């Protein structure tokens, strides 16, 4: 903090000495009608009784940290360069709010792809996805995983009604507060601009 204000500094966690392992696994993500390629990074995390868990992280290879000026001021509309620079960017203007929609969709789309791939590898036929995965949605930020999973299942040839049923059996939702300001609501034109494939 300086002068009563929070100051953020970049954290170069994806440098050559990072514990995050770059993989060859990539997924297509469409934002505002433009195709992007997300890359999976795996980070080993110490777990219970000496076991190891894996934290899956996604990034764009096109991220450009040189666009950061004075703390976290950057061009919020340059998605290819800044999508994952700062999660939960300043949303006091429309560009910041739309960037949040892009970020949320980017994360849930990649997670949904990975969940489906891992279920298929373990023997799922996707009609039985709930036997292979449980998706716990905490608060509203990752809730776009629901329509995204439905969309991806339909792309794989599953009818909409069954895709909805599969996702209903796979997803659980917990909301930790009932305060109105904690419940995200996005104007429909944000979704039409950022993720029209979900509408």
Summary of predicted features, one role per range:
Residues 1-199:
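A conserved ligand/cofactor-binding region detector
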